[in-house]
Amino acid sequence: MENVLSRKTKIIATIGPATMNQNVIVEMLKEGVNAFRINFSHSSHEQASQIVYLIRSAEKIANSRVPIIADLQGPTVRLGDFNDIEVNRENDYVISENEGIIVNEDVFYNLVETGDTIIIDGGRFWAKVKEKNGRKLKVRFMTEGVIGSRKTIAIQGKEYPLKAPTEKDISDLQFAIKSGIEGVAISFIKNKEDVLKVKEIAESSGGSVFTISKIETISGVNNIKDIVQVSDYILVARGDLGSHFPLVKIPEIQRHLIEVALDHGKPSIVATQLLDSMTVNPIPTRAEVTDVYTAVTMGADSLMVSGETAVGKHPVDVIRWLNDIAFEAERNQNLRVKGKSLDIYDKFAEGVVMMSELIDAKLVAITTTGKTPMRLARFRPKSEILAACESEFVFKKLQLTYGVMPVLLNSIKNDQQVVQELKALKFLKAGEKIIVTRSLKQGVTDAIKILEVQ
């Protein structure tokens, strides 16, 4: 339990058939889950409503409040409906509209060519196109297994010329807002306009959601500096990145995306196959442990699991392992991951972090928008950041930021009142030195006080 309370890296878990159970969700919350994800590629509105109800009910039992993230499907191409097909590396197989592996999308046939590498189900299946005859392909698989309906299909090194958001995305976004879901993950982003469109739709629908931009295309990587400026979070979607780039490039792309996020003061999330073997096995591989550890030391704010908790056999154990690995990475390394100071307020925040370490003081950030604790977090202080806020939306938004412990107060009148409430809630003790920082005008960090808790 000490690890759960001390861990600074945040954990996001996907809810699916394996975890659509209130007791399991309660256990995951107790093990330290900071947010839950609903994948709208696989969930109907009826199923999503049930998931929201289960999470909110579990929160009351576990005495916890966490954000829910709606992960929009985005403009992607998926297989059609067909009976499962077992493929091997010895035989040729057909991809067509009416036999073999079914694909009904014009955009796929317009883009695919002989010699292309096709990637199905986020990298689980790889095939080489041997022949193309109109809307019928002959392919040879490089991997083996059973392929089922509705899996994603991509062409390595190529992007489908599809616009975002789709009609389904808009419908799902509006549903999410009505359901009180706080965050939205935007899939297959190519440029900042894709993010701005989703924000406009959310605002016109009367909702407040924080945005997570999923970077998983060639254009998304190339335009990351523009995208990150209009996003609340960025997500390194390694599955689909592996469909567009050679796999050996993924570690450096991950490092680059995390560094760009840090440089712009935006938190980052690393996802896909973190503990994939735990979908079946109760213990992760050594390579998976090293992968998660490395993501933390690179500077990721959050770790997100998908199939491991959505359909896996050991969802609660997955959270325990993530918690322990992240805690170990933080404990054994002096994580001096730092972004660049962009303006005078960033330099001010960096100075506050340095001062807190020089005088061994805890950090208290009083915030209305969440920007002050986020500014502090990017410089990775040794102390936890207590973020006092009045807004439940800001409280939940901050739960995905490294080292930030948001605290929801009924009202904020002055610094002393906040400090005394934090003491009453046992976040602070008498005699502790603290640095209280806040903004005198919205959106900036420009005021501090050094106090001793009375």
Language-model segments: residues:
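Non-catalytic helical/linker scaffolds that mediate oligomerization, partner binding
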Residues: M1-Q454
